[in-house]
Amino acid sequence: PTGIPDFWLCALRNHEALAQYIEERDEPALSHLQDITVEPLTKDDVKDEENDDEEENDEDPKGFKLLFHFEQPNPFFENAVLTKTYHMVDDEDPILEFSEGTEIDWLAGKNLCVKVMRRKASAKGGKKPNKPATKTERTDSFFNFFSPPEIPDEDAELDENELEQLRDAMEMDYEIGS
């Protein structure tokens, strides 16, 4: 590869909104980031679930995609490009309707979004030696950016605190992407 080594890692580390989400363990994976590009949404990007009829929607979709291009192969995941898509309601005064991210195809044992907790399993009857048991737990990582906040169904009832947390998460998600 040509260019400045770890350019994108350095740029992301110096971005006010993003820097707080980059953990030390993310840095080796982000060192494989080669480019970040942005594209407007096209009709092919949008699956109109509300209009199941045969009518064509002539209106251009509102929103954009951020594409994170990674060196391949890399020792963390199989994806060459990780995408975050922002669907907007209005071009004039853009309002985030929802966002979606690429599912990352992590290589075995390399998922930076979880940590493996090891604990000693108890022996039954003292006959077998203890086997270490493991469980995974979500952890902070830049790569959680590709798993945006989920908007519950209209039927779901959220209390005021849950609604506020969802609103804050969506605002932060959009701030990072824009």
Predicted features along the sequence, with ranges:
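Mixed-charge, low-complexity intrinsically disordered segments
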Residues: 2-178
